[in-house]
Amino acid sequence: MNKQEIFNGLWTITKEKHKACKADAASVDKSHPTERGALQLKSGIYNVAIAAGLISGTDQAIELMSKRFKNLIKHFPDIANYYYTLHEDQKELMEIALYPEVFMRVNFYNTYNTDLEQAEKDGNPQIIFKAKIKKEVLDDILNMWREFRIQNELFTFAFDGKEEK
């Protein structure tokens, strides 16, 4: 796979998930506001994954992903060490294949886990409900992107079940 094919694959599966979730939310009767709101929240998080994790698919998305990746991997020393041993062409593939996951983990993973822990401490059922949805959707996004990488044999060692901080 080349960079564009990797990007297109990640973009397509994320966009499909977003559209399905958005359609599900629209199909729920307004007399069920909790279910509808939960689905709208899920749809919004998938949209964040598209807008931020995949840089909205802009023409410069691949270039920006490559540029930003170098700073973000500092949070994951094992991945960074491996990255710096690669030839340039392999580095470019790794940048695109891992950028969305690295971005979401750095910017949202700890926040969503901390939000859930705090909500559970506070005991507010509505906040717990929202925090669980956020964490569930983020986990789904990360798993979806990881599955894509595994199916395409792209840096399958990264985030292989061991939490990296």
Label every model-predicted segment.
Residues 3-19, 41, 97-113:
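Short amphipathic alpha-helical heptad-repeat segments
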Residues 15, 19-22, 26, 71, ...:
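Basic, mixed-charge low-complexity alpha-helical segments
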Residues 22-37, 54-59, 84, 88, ...:
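Charged, low-complexity interaction regions
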Residues 33, 37-51, 57, 94, ...:
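Alpha-helical oligomerization interfaces
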Residues 50-94, 103-104, 108:
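Long, low-complexity or tandemly repetitive, helically biased scaffold regions used
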Residues 141, 148-151, 155:
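Soluble, cytosolic/nucleoplasmic coiled-coil alpha-helices used as oligomeric scaffolds and tethers
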Residues 161-165:
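Short acidic DE-rich linear segments
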